[in-house]
Each structure stands twice: as C-alpha cells, then as structure tokens.
Regions:
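A generic, well-ordered mixed alpha/beta core segment in the N-terminal half of proteins
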Residues: 103, 107-150
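Histidine-centered, transition-metal-coordinating active-site segments
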Residues: 1-83, 87-93, 100-101, 133-341
Length: 341
C-alpha cells in the first residue's frame, strides 16, 4: 500500500525499483550549494526543472536566434524550440535506457540559457572580445549560479549544474543523463537546422550526403528515430550512452556538411551586422559601465567589468540587442520646420 505515503517517497521507491543501476537516483543527489527546506512532493531534480522553466533567461530563449537571423516564417527554430527538442529527445533516450528522465529534462532545459543573441555569431564575437574568452556552456552555468534571481542564482543541484556545463561534445558529464543530453543536443540541432535550411530554400533534400541519408533516413523523424534506436541497442544494460560507429560516422558526416554549406555561409551580411552591433555595444559599456542596468551593476562587486558586460550582452534577445544598439548609436529623427531630420 502506497496511497498514504508522501508523493516524493513513492517516486524514490519507483526509481530504486525500475531505474538502471547506472542511473542517477533522485534520492542520491549530491545536493545544492545552499541547503533548502525540501519539497514534500517534488524531487530535487523536478524542482530544478521547474526553476529553469520559470526563470527569465528561459523565457528569453524564444527570441534568440538558432541559425537564421530574424526569419520571416512562423516555423523556424529558435533557441526555445531547440531547447524543447533537446529535452524531448533526451527524455526519450533516458526512458529507453531506464535513466532518470527528470534529471535529463532539467539539464536539457538549462543547457542553452547562456547563449548569446544572433546564434553562434554572437558567441564568437564575445569570445574574441572578452579577455577571458566566452563559451555559452560556461555562461549557462553562470546564469543559473549567479545572474538569475537578482544575483542569488537558482541554486540547482550538482548533477544539473554538471550537465549544463559539460553538455558540449568535448565535455565529460558525470552522469549518464548528462551524456544523453549532450547527444540529444547534437541530434536536435543537426536535424532541425537541415529543416530550416530546406525551408529557407538554401538546401534541397537531394543536396544532403547520400551515404549519411542511407544510414539515417530521409525525413527528420526517420533520422531521429534511427539514432535513438541505435543508442538503445548499443547502450542498454551498459554503463555508457553510445552510438554505433556506423551511425556516429553518418551523424558526423551530416554535421560536417552543415558546417561547410550552412553555418559558415548563412546570410553573411546579417552576420557582419550582428558582429558590428555587439562589438560597438561591448566597447560602449566598457567605457560607461555605470549605464548598465542596475541588476548587472550589482554583480560588479564580485566580477570584472568585462564579465559584467558579457553577462548583459549575452542575456539579450536578438530584438532587444538591436533596440539597444539603435538607442545608443542611431540618431532619432525629429521635425525641424516641417522637415524630418
């Protein structure tokens, strides 16, 4: 009989009974940097997921570019839709391998919170400008640790923080759920970026490398299903999350194709404009840091001004960045004797 037991305790029992021995059980979390009163209903990983969803940084993802700047259609991918794709794929992998779905989902929802406006162009610009460099995964961790909640951060669990920091392909997550998110990120962005490129008229289906298509499938749903199925067959019952060599090679071939034909060529004029805007604003706020919003000024007590300027710029949406740039550098028109100046 479990009806009278606390909801969270029932969750712990179910995880102990049904999750893989290699999964991170919610009851085994290493905890938070600051102790908190436990929730009677939610596990710590479930609380992390909710905190991320309700954060301001998560809300702003809907107006941050994935690949195509300010697309005019309704169905192009943004950072928010990419994040939701990653969360769905990560949960599917976790479910197939009997891993902790709540942990995988929380990591996935937080993995891109520190991404810049204007996609990877913005990241490259800030990396070049900042003396300490800039990586969106490191900034995502700073968002949840420091920037959110007026400098208090979200106080997430160690496992979610690790997964956010280590989600890049070069990372080494401490949990299998973190590995699942890293793979899900790659699966998601390669496939939906192909969709966007075809939608924009830059690619045709027939342009894709046929060796990779033969392995993975023609349609997005086929490719995603092929990879998740392969991960399951390769990883079930083991202490890892892997693709087979054949499928991994096909994914890498698609990724290389996209870098050669899309990521390095997409709307060069817009990329140049984005670089000029971010460079100009970076220089302006370094010179006049007192003109930063108050919430960022408050962070300056514990970080150099270069970091605080990067905090502000990386947190902008595409539209907000354009608006701030115009407000700083584009003269307003006004009427003088009936003539607009």
């Amino acid at each position: 009989m479990t009806e009278g037991r606390p909801v969270k305790e029932r969750t712990y029992e179910m995880e102990s009974r049904y999750l893989s021995p290699y999964a991170k059980k919610s009851a085994e979390t290493a905890g938070r940097a600051r102790e908190e009163v436990p929730c009677a209903f939610r596990t710590d990983f479930q609380r992390d997921r909710d905190r991320i969803i309700y954060s301001n940084s998560f809300k702003r993802l809907k107006n941050k570019t994935q690949v195509f700047f300010a697309p005019e259609g309704d169905h192009y991918i943004t950072r928010l839709t990419h994040t939701l794709d990653v969360a769905q794929i990560a949960r599917a992998i976790a479910r197939a391998l009997s891993l902790n779905e709540d942990l995988a989902e929380a990591i996935a929802l937080g993995h891109d919170l520190g991404h810049t406006p204007f996609g990877h162009v913005g990241e490259r610009v800030l990396d070049k400008l900042s003396p300490s460099g800039f990586e969106h995964n490191v900034q995502s961790l700073r968002v949840v640790d420091v920037i959110e909640k007026d400098g208090r951060g979200l106080n997430l669990t160690a496992e979610v923080r690790d997964g956010i920091l280590q989600h890049k392909s070069s990372g080494h997550p401490a949990t299998l759920e973190g590995v699942a998110v890293s793979l899900a990120d790659r699966i998601a962005y390669i496939n939906h970026d192909i969709e966007d490129a075809i939608r924009a008229g830059i690619l045709k289906d027939s342009d894709l490398p046929q060796n990779a298509v033969a392995v993975l499938g023609h349609a997005t749903r086929e490719r995603i299903n092929t990879v998740i199925t392969d991960i399951y067959l390769r990883s079930a019952g083991t202490d890892g999350v892997h693709m087979s060599e054949n499928v991994a090679d096909a994914m890498n071939e698609l990724r290389s194709f996209m870098f050669r034909n899309i990521y390095s060529l997409t709307n060069k004029s817009m990329q140049d404009r984005a670089e000029r805007m971010l460079t100009a604003m970076y220089g302006y706020f370094l010179r006049y840091p007192e003109r930063l919003p108050e919430q960022y000024l408050a962070l300056a007590e514990n970080a150099p001004k270069e970091q605080i300027v990067c905090d502000y710029l990386s947190g902008m949406t595409d539209r907000y960045a354009i608006g701030v740039f115009e407000g700083l550098f584009i003269p307003e028109t006004f009427s003088l004797g009936g003539v607009t100046v």
